[in-house]
Amino acid sequence: MLLGSVPQLDRVAVQLGPFPVYWYGIIIGTGVLLGLWLATREGERLGIPKDTFVDLVLIAVPIAILFARMYYVIFEWEYYVQNPSQIINIRQGGLAIHGGLIGAVITGILFAKRRGVSFWKLADIAAPSILLGQAIGRWGNFMNQEAHGDEVTRQFLEGLHLPDFIINQMYIDGVYYHPTFLYESLWNFAGVILLLALRKVNLRRGELFFTYLIWYSIGRFFVEGLRTDSLMLGPLRIAQVMSIGLVVISIIFIIVRRKMGQADKRYSEN
């Protein structure tokens, strides 16, 4: 597709009759499947049957998407109260990761209790998978030309040595923008590598998941400061507030669980 003289990628991957299939959904789905593959491999190594994570994903993903959308709609209520028909339209984005995390954690706790397994063990195994899914999912924002930063020049983007297809996709309505999706995606990919390495350190149970929350939140805090489409509560960027909260809560949980003897088991213990 051409916008002016700048070639760009079409957000629609394929048209099935009257129904467009968007790259956003394909990319999100790919992230889920690769994350599931990573979790099932590690789960089997630690004695958790493959179908445990398959069942968890089948339940948690729809609920996480629902919570992600609800979270987004709540903080954009002025728009959606005037356009209620758009509340269920997620084909072009509008999913908030923090809302999805809330839904996923609630589902994971209830699922673990019902299956009689440790939630912290499931969370630790799933942590790299969740971050991998987030790293891949940001490319859905890229295809939708959303979640970008402030205005920049083409020369600035070329100075980052980015490939032309990224630079061109950051040209929106006659202006080039910061590719904040890319910054966060690269940060998340680096986090996946870190979490996979920390598996070998054999941390106390639950601490790999808290490390994920801390790592992701630090990156998200700084990237969010560059974005132009942040969900706001008065003068505050909600994602930055949530990021600070998650870092503080994670550190407190690590310290308190150790002092209370609730983190005696190690990552690889049954």
Curated annotation (Swiss-Prot):
Disulfide bond annotation, renumbered to this chain: none
Main localization category: membrane
PROSITE patterns from the UniProt entry: LGT
Example of a GO MF term: phosphatidylglycerol-prolipoprotein diacylglyceryl transferase activity
Superkingdom per UniProt: Bacteria
Entry-linked PANTHER family: PHOSPHATIDYLGLYCEROL--PROLIPOPROTEIN DIACYLGLYCERYL TRANSFERASE, PROLIPOPROTEIN DIACYLGLYCERYL TRANSFERASE
Record-linked NCBIfam families: lgt
Function: Catalyzes the transfer of the diacylglyceryl group from phosphatidylglycerol to the sulfhydryl group of the N-terminal cysteine of a prolipoprotein, the first step in the formation of mature lipoproteins.
Name under which the protein is recorded: Phosphatidylglycerol--prolipoprotein diacylglyceryl transferase
Species for this entry: Bacillus cereus (strain 03BB102)
